[in-house]
From Swiss-Prot:
GO terms for cellular component: cytoplasm. Its main location: cytoplasm. It comes from Mycolicibacterium paratuberculosis (strain ATCC BAA-968 / K-10) (Mycobacterium paratuberculosis). The record marks D95 as: Stabilizes the basic form of H active site to accept a proton. It is found in: Cytoplasm. This is Peptidyl-tRNA hydrolase. It comes from the Bacteria. PANTHER family: PEPTIDYL-TRNA HYDROLASE. Hydrolyzes ribosome-free peptidyl-tRNAs (with 1 or more amino acids incorporated), which drop off the ribosome during protein synthesis, or as a result of ribosome stalling. It catalyses: an N-acyl-L-alpha-aminoacyl-tRNA + H2O = an N-acyl-L-amino acid + a tRNA + H(+). Keywords: Cytoplasm, Hydrolase, RNA-binding, tRNA-binding. Gene3D superfamilies: Peptidyl-tRNA hydrolase. Belongs to the PTH family. Its EC number is 3.1.1.29.
């Protein structure tokens, strides 16, 4: 039996972070779990919450680390080891300041762009060569600190678009699973 793909939505645990820009990865992971018809449960060895099943015809484990964003690797590393998933078969869904609000991009490897959650995952895996679903949250206005900006709730105008953006990011994740990186990029980057 082929090893599953590991899909990780990044975010911070707790109700006070649930609607923040930094938590779009969790929002998309929740949508994927709903599409799989499953609910998250605790994974004892890693501490993350997981859902196992099938997406786009593949065996998939969707995970939400239950530690803070900057420590995500502490739970992603043990999950990857437990399921014997190499970095190239891991998809991390995360917010991205360098993309305009609502833009979705797919890539593999590369830098972290100041995203400490990505840095933590890369350090835990010993590799940056995992796939990424990048969800644009835009840059903070004026001289606002990016670290504070990502922990704020979406504006009321943005909030109206977040459900559609998360659905598109979930669709992009399924295309990545089904088609592989380059064909999925060709489709998603044309949106």
């Amino acid at each position: 039996m082929a090893e599953p793909l590991l899909v990780v939505g990044l975010g911070n645990p707790g109700d006070n972070y649930a609607r923040t820009r930094h938590n779009v990865g969790f929002m998309v992971a929740d949508l994927l779990a709903a599409r799989m018809g499953s609910k998250f449960k605790a994974h004892k060895r890693s501490g993350a919450e997981i859902v196992s099943g099938r997406l786009a015809g593949r065996s998939v484990v969707v995970a939400k680390p239950r530690c803070y964003m900057n420590e995500s690797g502490r739970q992603v590393g043990p999950l990857a080891k437990f399921y014997s998933v190499p970095p190239g078969d891991i998809i991390v869904i995360h917010d991205d300041l360098d993309l305009d609000f609502g833009r979705i991009r797919l890539k593999i490897g590369g830098g972290e762009g100041g995203h400490n959650g990505l840095r933590s995952v890369a350090n835990a895996l010993g590799s940056k060569d995992f796939q990424r679903v990048r969800i644009g949250i835009g840059r903070p206005p004026g001289r606002k600190d990016p670290a504070a900006f990502v922990l704020e709730n979406f504006t009321s105008t943005e909030r109206a678009d977040v459900p559609t953006i998360c659905e598109q990011a979930a669709d992009a994740t399924e295309l990545l699973i089904e088609l592989g990186l380059e064909p999925a990029q060709n489709r998603v980057h044309a949106w």
